[in-house]
Structures are given as C-alpha cells and as structure tokens.
C-alpha cells in the first residue's frame, strides 16, 4: 500500500480486504464491507472480493483479533496519570483524587477522554465502559475518536436526599442525551458508584431506572475489605446481598473489582447473570490484599471480563498488559499455575467483554461488527509463534498492535492515527491547568 493510499484509508467506512492474516488457526482473508460488518472470512476468499474492495491490506506477518473491550475505566482520569501514587486507597481518594476532581470542567473531561481513546486505539481496544462526570463531553470525545463506549454518570448521593435528587436528574439527562445522539457506537448506563457512596434509596432508584429504560448498570463492588466490613456494620449484610435487595443484580449489571466476594456472593452473582470486571493492575497497585475469586465466579456462571480502571490507579489502559497481570495474579494468589490459562484471559478481553458491554460477540465471524485489530508477529516478543494465545497474553504488549478498526472504520493503520499530536498537546495543557486550579487558594 502506498503512502497516498494509506492516507486515504482513514475517514468514512471503506470496503477493505485483508489478505493472508493469521486468525490464530492459520492464514485467512477477511472482507469488511462498507456497511460496518465483516461480510466474509475464510481461506482464499480474496478471489471473490478483490474486485469490490476499495483497499487491500496485506496481513502477512500479523495476527487478527477481535477488538478488545475494557469493561471498567474512568477515561478522563488519564489527565491524573502519575498525579498521586503509592498511597493507601482511602487516603488516595480523600486527600488527592476527590479534591482534584472538584475542579474538573467539561473541557477537562473532553480532552481526558480523547487522550484515553487515543491510548486505547493504540493498544487495540475498540470498546470501553466508562463512569465519570460531565459525560456529555465524554460522549462527544468518543464520537469523534470513533470507538465504542458504554457511558454512565457516576451517581453519588452520600445519603443526602437533595443530592440524590440531583443525581437522579443528572442520570436521566445523560441517558436522554446519548439516545438523542442516535449513534450505534455509544450507549448509556446507570452508574451508582458503590454501596459505600450511594444510599439504599439511591441504589433502588438506579435499579428501577435501569429496568424501566432497559439499560446496563455499572457499579464498583467489594473492592476492599474495609468497604465490606463497613457495609455489614451499616446494613447488616454484605455488599452483593445489599445490591440484590435493591434490584441491581441482573444480566445488565457490570460489577467492577469483586476482590472481597465470598463464596455465597459468587454464587449469587452467577445466579443473577452478572458480569464481573477484573481489574488486577489497579487492585495490586492500591493493595486491596486479595485477588478476584475467578474460579468461583466462573463456576457459578458469572461472566468474568477485564478492565484497567482509570489511569490514576493503573497507570495505563493497555489490555494486553492487563491480560498478563490477570493471569499471573490468579496463579500467584491462589497458588495454582493452571488458573486462568492464556486462552481464558484472551476471552475475557474479547468475547466476555463484548458480551458485558452489549457490543456484539467479540468474535471474527461473518456478520459480526467490523471491530478488529492486527497485531504484528514480526517482533522479538512474538517470535517464535508456537501458540498465538500464549504470545498475546504473556509475551507482547499493546505496542504490537499495528491496525485498529472499529465499526468498519480504520482508526489506526501501520501505527498512524490522524490528529494524534493535537490530542496529546491539548490533553497535556488541560491536565496542567486542572492541577493549577486545584492548587490555587479559593
């Protein structure tokens, strides 16, 4: 492909034929039509599509994967990357993060989300689940970046009835706004922050609203031992039981963390069909002292997927790195090298994540949304290629992603992303201004 052709491949959807790419089982061709879907995939299909493809991409030396799904993050917190590290979780939140967030503006969230989308595109993520503030600005950023997102307003009432009313109205407004966009890549969710920041009344409202609107629920659950103990002391029940009582556990629910779930809670989440987002890097960095009970959740029937959390506590959005950390943490903590094998970790970041977010099946099959990435095998870390899943999980990083396609649109080709320098400059400026505002006496 010539330089001129490379420039032309960006922008509106094009019909693209990817030839001789390895899908993990062997070389195949993939034809993406101009209608945003994978219309054909298989050996030697180039013969019947070569004449209709606007662009032909030589996939030799690359692995094709479904686009990855990040099922828990706070995208705009990319502006807080490196701002506060090596602290106890509650101190980190109360002393550094929440005071800084009090100075956030809609413009900050826009540029922080653009920066996060840029990083995700670079590392092969085509869909993410986001909870934060000024989410109309986040939606604008996602729309312009070209990837998929499930967005919710972080509902926090702290037991205050007046604040709860404001949070309800903010949630309703965001859902109406996103539906008004009529963008198939951007969906809305209800976002009760956590059982320790939202009253039972607020939790019940979110549960009822999600049922009425048929939208997902995104919530933090049992991240630390302290929040579990506090919940038992305050409500005489563990967090998962409280959420169930409030009508918040269903197949629409994505619960992040889950480090301190017990066996009964794992069984309950499985029974309710909940998706649980494992965020191992953030959990280890903030020392939550326990790993997600992965085996118990899977055995119970829960859909276990993968998330990075925000850049303030990770500090990146690279799901390749997260797959490796997840697999290693499970093996180390549970003292069993067979737990969370490489194909399972890959499934968490692809099929399981797509299922949780409601964006297709996370598979490379005819008729599927054209969300896929090409990962180079021509690197030391991917040589030799005895086992594709093993290399992808244990050996390579997101820097091996060369091409990212979402909804049939090429967002990155040969590591080039149009407009990258402007996003980097604007995001850096927004971060600097945010910190200055927070440090200026009122």
Curated annotation (Swiss-Prot):
Look up the record and name the pathway of this protein.
Answer: Amino-acid biosynthesis; S-adenosyl-L-methionine biosynthesis
User: Which keywords describe this protein according to UniProt?
Assistant: Hydrolase, Metal-binding, Zinc
Please provide, alphabetically and separated by semicolons, the GO molecular function terms listed in this UniProt record. Answer: 5'-deoxyadenosine deaminase activity; 5'-methylthioadenosine deaminase activity; adenosine deaminase activity; metal ion binding; S-adenosylhomocysteine deaminase activity
The cofactor named in the record is: Zn(2+)
User: What other note does the entry give for this protein?
Assistant: SAH is a product of SAM methyltransferases and is known to be a feedback inhibitor of these enzymes. As a result of this inhibition, organisms have evolved efficient enzymes to metabolize SAH via different pathways. The pathway found in methanogens differs from the canonical pathway, it uses the deamination of S-adenosyl-L-homocysteine to form S-inosyl-L-homocysteine for the regeneration of SAM from S-adenosyl-L-homocysteine. 5'-deoxyadenosine is a radical SAM enzyme reaction product which strongly inhibits radical SAM enzymes.
| Leader sequence residues | none
Tell me the subunit arrangement.
Answer: Homotetramer.
Q: Which residues does the record give as Zn(2+) binding sites?
A: 72, 74, 220, 309
Family in the record:
Belongs to the metallo-dependent hydrolases superfamily. MTA/SAH deaminase family.
Which residues of this UniProt protein bind substrate? 101, 193, 223, 309
- Record keyword Nucleus present: no
Q: What is this protein called?
A: 5'-deoxyadenosine deaminase
- EC number(s) on file: 3.5.4.41, 3.5.4.31, 3.5.4.4, 3.5.4.28
Which SUPFAM superfamilies does the UniProt record give?
A: Composite domain of metallo-dependent hydrolases, Metallo-dependent hydrolases
Protein purpose: Catalyzes the deamination of three SAM-derived enzymatic products, namely 5'-deoxyadenosine, S-adenosyl-L-homocysteine, and 5'-methylthioadenosine, to produce the inosine analogs. Can also deaminate adenosine. The preferred substrate for this enzyme is 5'-deoxyadenosine, but all these substrates are efficiently deaminated. Likely functions in a S-adenosyl-L-methionine (SAM) recycling pathway from S-adenosyl-L-homocysteine (SAH) produced from SAM-dependent methylation reactions.
Q: Which InterPro entries does this one have?
A: Amidohydro-rel (IPR006680), Deaminase_MtaD/DadD (IPR023512), Metal-dep_hydrolase_composite (IPR011059), Metal_Hydrolase (IPR032466), MTA/SAH_deaminase (IPR050287)
Binding note for cofactor: Binds 1 zinc ion per subunit.
This enzyme catalyses: 5'-deoxyadenosine + H2O + H(+) = 5'-deoxyinosine + NH4(+); S-adenosyl-L-homocysteine + H2O + H(+) = S-inosyl-L-homocysteine + NH4(+); S-methyl-5'-thioadenosine + H2O + H(+) = S-methyl-5'-thioinosine + NH4(+); adenosine + H2O + H(+) = inosine + NH4(+)
The keyword Metal-binding appears for this protein: yes
Q: Which GO terms describe its biological process?
A: S-adenosylmethionine biosynthetic process
């Amino acid at each position: 492909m010539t330089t001129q052709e490379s420039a032309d491949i960006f922008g509106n959807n094009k019909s693209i034929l990817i030839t001789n790419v390895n899908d993990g089982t062997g070389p195949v061709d993939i034809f993406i039509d101009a209608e945003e879907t994978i219309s054909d995939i298989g050996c030697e299909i180039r013969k019947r599509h070569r004449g209709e493809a606007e662009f032909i991409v030589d996939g030799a030396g690359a692995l094709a994967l479904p686009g990855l799904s990040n099922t828990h993050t706070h995208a705009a917190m990319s502006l807080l990357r490196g701002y506060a590290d090596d602290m106890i979780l509650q101190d980190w939140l109360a002393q550094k993060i929440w005071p800084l967030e009090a100075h956030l503006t809609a413009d900050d969230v826009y540029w922080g989300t653009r920066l996060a989308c840029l990083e995700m595109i670079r590392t092969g993520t085509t869909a993410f689940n986001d909870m934060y503030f000024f989410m109309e600005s986040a939606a604008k950023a996602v729309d312009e970046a070209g990837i998929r997102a499930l967005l919710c307003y972080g509902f926090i009432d702290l037991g205050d009835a007046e604040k709860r009313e404001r949070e309800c109205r903010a949630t309703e407004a965001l859902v109406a706004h996103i539906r008004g966009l009529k963008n198939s890549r951007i969906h809305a969710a209800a976002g009760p922050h956590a059982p320790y920041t939202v009253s039972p009344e607020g939790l019940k409202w979110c549960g009822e609203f999600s049922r009425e609107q048929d939208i997902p629920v995104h919530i933090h659950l049992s991240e630390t031992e302290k929040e579990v103990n506090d919940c038992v002391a305050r409500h005489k029940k563990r967090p998962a039981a409280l959420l169930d009582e409030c009508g918040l556990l269903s197949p629409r629910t994505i619960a992040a963390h889950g480090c301190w779930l017990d066996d009964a809670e794992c069984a309950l989440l499985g029974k309710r069909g909940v998706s649980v987002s494992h965020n191992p890097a953030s959990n280890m960095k903030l020392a939550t002292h326990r790993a997600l009970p992965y085996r118990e959740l899977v055995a119970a029937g829960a859909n276990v997927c993968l998330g990075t959390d925000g850049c303030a506590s990770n500090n990146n959005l690279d799901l390749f790195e997260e797959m490796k950390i997840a697999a290693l943490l499970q093996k180390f903590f549970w003292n069993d090298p067979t737990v969370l094998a490489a194909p399972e970790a890959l499934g968490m970041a692809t099929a399981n994540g797509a299922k949780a977010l409601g964006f297709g099946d996370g598979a490379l099959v005819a008729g599927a949304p054209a969300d896929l990435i090409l990962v180079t095998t021509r690197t030391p870390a991917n040589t030799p290629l005895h086992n594709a899943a093993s290399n992808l999980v244990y050996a390579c990083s997101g820097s091996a992603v060369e091409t990212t396609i979402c909804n049939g649109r090429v967002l990155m080709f040969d590591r080039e992303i149009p407009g990258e320098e402007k996003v980097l400059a604007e995001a850096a400026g927004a971060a600097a201004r945010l910190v200055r505002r927070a440090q200026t006496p009122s």
